[in-house]
Design a protein with these regions (language model features):
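ATP-binding N-terminal substructure of ATP-dependent carboxylate-amine bond-forming enzymes
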Residues: 1-101, 135-139
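Short gly/pro/ser/thr-enriched loop/turn and capping motifs at secondary-structure boundaries
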Residues: 36-39, 103-107, 156-157
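Active-site nucleotide/adenylate-binding loops and adjacent lid/helix of ATP-dependent enzymes
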Residues: 107-187
Length: 187
């Protein structure tokens, strides 16, 4: 039986999760890197744990390990999902996991894997290219119909860097220029 939920991350979803858990009598522990979370101010949260490094985050979660599964780990953003995937086997022994098995997460968190899965199984998805170099982009630039978008395979680190989820390119020159600029900052 779930007695506690550890909500990982400061996404707005944390507030809704905290309120729902509190409504059914589950203790809510919010684990965030800073105080910039609306859930931080909620009376539905019984405890807030701040961390500054992954090692510190790991230690704070491990301090809630028990012999009986009674705590649910629930991420609210891609960064926290990636963290739980990294420690999935260890945490799954003592916590309920708010994510599926790592192979499922990997299939759907990386758009290259998702789109390839869809194509293989005849599921409609955007036509996509996966260039590794600017030379690949130049070759693709002659094959596509414009406008196109440049979108990363994994969103959260791209969005942190550029403040956008995608870039629209209206022609070949714009595609090559944007891809070159992105490649300099986002390997």
């Amino acid at each position: 039986m779930v007695r506690n939920v550890i909500i990982l991350g400061s996404h707005i979803q944390a507030l809704g999760l905290a309120r729902q858990a509190n409504t059914i009598g589950v203790e809510v522990i919010l684990v965030i890197p800073d105080r910039y979370s609306v859930a931080y101010f909620s009376n539905a949260v019984s405890k807030v744990l701040l961390y500054s490094t992954e090692k510190e985050l790991y230690g704070k979660i491990c301090s809630y390990k028990t012999n009986v599964k009674e705590t649910l780990l629930f991420p609210t953003n891609d960064e926290m999902i990636e963290f739980l995937v990294k420690y999935y086997d260890e945490f799954n022994e003592t916590f309920y996991m708010g994510i599926p098995k790592p192979e499922t997460v990997t299939l759907f968190s990386d758009k290259r894997n998702t789109y390839r899965f869809c194509e293989k199984n005849h599921i409609a998805c955007p036509h996509s290219w996966y260039p590794d170099t600017i030379e690949d982009v130049k070759q693709i630039a002659d094959e596509v119909d414009y406008p196109v978008i440049i979108k990363p395979s994994i969103m959260y680190s791209f969005h942190k860097l550029f403040g956008k989820k995608a870039f629209r390119c209206n022609d070949k020159n714009e595609l090559i220029l944007r891809a070159t600029a992105i490649a300099k900052r986002f390997p």
